[in-house]
Amino acid sequence: MMSSAEIQGLAQRFADAFGNKDVEAVVGMLAEDVEVFDHVPYRFDDKAQFAGYLSGAVGAFTSMSFAFRQPSCRMLDDAVGIVNAYDSFAGVTKDGKVQVLHGRTTLVFGKRGGEWKIVSAHFSPLPQAS
């Protein structure tokens, strides 16, 4: 059975790949039928849809970083693991604008064909302080 520490390692691999603009590695971690809720007002219903969006979004930045804070990782059974965390994103766009976002992430990992894949992902911004 996979341990919560191993699931946390997979989540870290995801964060590192995203922060390094390695879209291929991020997409490689997704199940074909992944569902993703991101910072846009619609849902992605499969890997191909999200890959197209992600490629365009990452391509808008010359540099970026991404990290998880306070990850909570747990196994539901021998085929499902969940990671909840706060996330921090910083990037510089091609026109030199700095973007900093703080949010929440939930990644659900499922065993698919002997491999752990992200089967569901939810990214949402933290409320702005008033």
Describe these PLM feature segments.
Residues 102-129:
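Short beta-strand edge/turn micro-motifs at domain boundaries
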